[in-house]
Curated annotation (Swiss-Prot):
Belongs to the bacterial ribosomal protein bL33 family. This is Large ribosomal subunit protein bL33. One of its GO terms (cellular component) is cytoplasm. HAMAP family: Ribosomal_bL33 (MF_00294).
Amino acid sequence: MRIHVVLGNDETGERIYLTSKNRRNTPDRLELKKYSPKLRKVVTFKEIK
């Protein structure tokens, strides 16, 4: 079953990315490298509960 998750950046507090994940395959929190418009570079965005 796929669920929707919000990705946030700890440095800037941005929550601009929405994605989905399969809970069975990735039970841990998701971490993806995405572009941050505020920082103008690619940074790590983590899943927010």
